[in-house]
Swiss-Prot record:
GO terms for cellular component: cytosolic large ribosomal subunit. One of its GO terms (molecular function) is structural constituent of ribosome. Belongs to the universal ribosomal protein uL16 family. Binds 23S rRNA and is also seen to make contacts with the A and possibly P site tRNAs. SUPFAM superfamilies: Ribosomal protein L16p/L10e. Keywords: Ribonucleoprotein, Ribosomal protein, RNA-binding, rRNA-binding, tRNA-binding. This is Large ribosomal subunit protein uL16. It comes from the Bacteria. GO terms for biological process: translation.
Length: 140
């Protein structure tokens, strides 16, 4: 699973995912990309599930770029514990995704756009947000 090697703080403040993405909103590497249409927290397990879905479909004919990384830890207190006595322990790692962010990029060596589009469609079903598939050069 994806997670940072070291962090400055174990339990950071929660970051907002409202508004538009300021960075990573241009297709840099691949021919097609999966772009977020809404903001959310995406867990490391969801990113990994999407990556596996794409690479299994494309086999060895393509390359996948992942543009998001789960830097933020979310905490949770144990069940049936009274309020107070500090913040809970880190439960999972999430990536903060805002509207317009390029999540994944794909390039097929056989230059088959059908394969690229289908791989991104399969990956989009693994994510908890609405997404759209964009071709390089088109408006994100």
């Amino acid at each position: 699973m994806l997670m940072p090697k070291r962090t400055k703080y174990r339990r950071p403040h929660r970051v907002s995912f409202e508004g538009k993405s300021k960075g990573k909103n241009v297709i840099a590497n691949g021919n097609h990309a999966l772009v977020a249409k809404e903001g959310a927290f995406i867990t490391n397990k969801q990113i990994e599930a999407a990556r596996i879905a794409m690479t299994r479909y494309m086999k060895r004919t393509g390359k996948v770029w992942i543009n998001i990384f789960p830097h933020l830890s979310l905490t949770k207190k144990p069940l049936e514990v009274r309020m107070g006595s500090g913040k809970g322990s880190p439960e999972e790692w999430v990536a903060v995704v805002k509207t317009g962010k390029v999540l994944f990029e794909v390039k097929d060596t056989t230059n088959s756009s059908k394969v690229e589009m289908e791989a991104l469609r399969l990956a989009s079903h693994k994510l908890p947000i609405k997404t759209k598939i964009v071709k390089k050069g088109a408006e994100v």
